[in-house]
Swiss-Prot record:
Physiological role: NDH-1 shuttles electrons from NADH, via FMN and iron-sulfur (Fe-S) centers, to quinones in the respiratory chain. The immediate electron acceptor for the enzyme in this species is believed to be a menaquinone. Couples the redox reaction to proton translocation (for every two electrons transferred, four hydrogen ions are translocated across the cytoplasmic membrane), and thus conserves the redox energy in a proton gradient.
GO-annotated cellular components: plasma membrane
Catalytic activity: a quinone + NADH + 5 H(+)(in) = a quinol + NAD(+) + 4 H(+)(out)
Protein name: NADH-quinone oxidoreductase subunit N
Superkingdom per UniProt: Bacteria
Signal peptide extent: none
Gene that specifies this protein: nuoN
Family: Belongs to the complex I subunit 2 family.
Amino acid sequence: MDMNTLLSLSWHLMVPEFIILGAAILLSICDLFFKLNHRYVALGAIAAVVLAIVSLITLYSEPAGDILNGSFVLDGFSKGFKTLLLGGAALILCTAMSDDKKNPIEDKGEYYYLFLMALLGAMFMASSVDFVTLFVGLELLSLSSYILVGIRKKNRASNEAAMKYVINGGIGTAITLFGMSYLYGITGSTNIVDMQKVFAGELASGIQLLLALAFLLLLVGLSFKIATVPFHMWAPDVYEGAATPVTAFLGTISKMAGFLLIIRLFLMVFASVSVQGDMQSLYGRMSIYIAVLASITMIIGNVVALKQYNVKRLFAYSGIAHAGYLLVPLVALSPFTMDSMWFYMLAYMLMNIGAFAIIHGLILQSNKENITIFTGLYKRSPFTAIVMTIFILSLAGIPGTAGFIGKINIFLGALHVEPAHYVLASIMMGTTVISFVYYFRILQQMFFRTGEVEEKIRLPLNIKIVMSFCAISIVILGIVPMIGYNFFYEYFPLMKDFFFLGNVVQ
């Protein structure tokens, strides 16, 4: 490829990725040679993410396009979910500026540029429509996350968590690759758009059997990534052992990236495969397995959370349950699937990052991770208690919060399709009621229990900014949800260019 051809490519589609990559390289070099104060590295990382958000906003009006021989696309889907990834990353980086003095991260500079590399991997996963770039993004996210979990090298729990994460992550990646290999063997291509063209024709029954096997392998492999039951056993230990901002990253950015990969692969590949003698697609036939996975994930996640008293383990099981909720719209495919998933991920990101920001601040004060860190919080810091209450009510799905809007839309979406998924909707409603018990236990600690220590709690300014922004956003989206939905419909036309990507970018 000559220089003129190289320069003629649509590199502007990758400007947000270039900004994150450049910042990670620049910060690593500066930290290596100049030994910068970690606060300057943190501010540099935050500035890079904000700049990437601005550059992405300038691309909102850009029509769907592709680069790198069609393996990287910028469509409504990638724009919408990259906005969430970058916004969540900025909030987590702001939270991470407050350090744990009693249990510090030794290599604080590495912490920030590894975070940026993990974010870059997640962004690549949002835009990739080729197995090669998908896998590069997945591994960039995974390898950086493994190191982030174990970056507190002198902490035994952190080392144990990193080891468990590496082993389980490696197993999940191997199974995912095995499933991808079947698709490559059947189609002779690693490009998802090319696969759609192959599957548009008639397929022999033996090929359909191999495709069903590939579906199951990919479902199992990616279930490790999003921590659904029974592939969730790593999550509680990893959440507990990692530094709190890393836990927030795993519970939001990493989980969202896993769902993006599931959506790309399953809805673009398997939904295009017709089953012989049936009007249903292969995805429609196999979605029963996703329904079973969603059901047991919602049940086990919420029931086991009832017995958790370590606050990070409690939120780990809460996250497992929410992964089950997010699988429901993938079973009950409807015109509302994409917007309900986007809004739910937005609400989930805000309430989780906000809650983890407060948890991080309380752990810094008490050096404990038990649920008793919330004891008497209303007397010690009324504002913090009220803000945490907003997050808890939103996680529980109480009306007036963004969490309620997200859950009710998924619930109604399950009933809107034909045939309606009454069992799945009933399980979702029942497990939501169960979640009230462990969520309201935190409220009980804050308002109705008296702690041994009565001194006032003063959280760092950066944590106050993060939790205030998240709380205000949750209330606004809960009262006027059309603000979020109108933004989604105006800038991210997913139904236009997601399912018909080959026609749009060519």
